[in-house]
Amino acid sequence: MAAQKTKKKYVVTLNDVSGTLDNDLFKKMASKGDITSVSVTEVVYQTITVTGTAYATIETDEKTFKMSYFNTEEYGIIHCGGGTLFDESLGDYMADGVTKFRINSVKCKLGTGYKAVPILE
C-alpha cells in the first residue's frame, strides 16, 4: 500500500495589484501558487522597465511572509521580499511615475542589499 501524501499549506493572498499584473490570469496563478519568477538578485546591474506590480502575503506550514512581484518588459516577473530595500526604493520612485530602473547592489550592515535606481531620460 502506498504512503499517503500530506498536503502542504501554501496560501497566497494578493494584497495589492496594478498594471499588467492586475488581471484574472495572474490572480489564478497566485491562487494556485504557480507564479514563476526571477529573483532580483539574478538581474543585478541590469535595466528593467516595470509594467505591473503585486504585493502578496504567503502562508506555509512553517511561516508567513511578504513577497513583492514586478512584471518587467525585459525579464518577465521578478520578485523580492516585501519591505526590502529594493521593494521600498522601487515603490517610492514608481509613485513619482518612474518605470525604468537599474538594479544596483549596495553594502549594508547585514551584508548586501539591492536598490532600484531610476534611470533619468
Locate predicted features:
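Short, charged beta-turn/beta-strand-edge "cap" motif at the junction between a beta-strand
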Residues: D96, N104-E121
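Arginine residue identity/basic-tract feature
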Residues: K7-K9, K100-R102, K115
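Short nucleic-acid-contacting surface segments enriched for D/E, G, S/T with interspersed K/R
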Residues: V38-V43, L85-N104
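GIY-YIG-like beta-to-alpha core
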Residues: G76-E88
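OB-fold ssDNA-binding interfaces and closely related basic DNA-contact patches used
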Residues: M1-E74, L110-G111, I119-E121
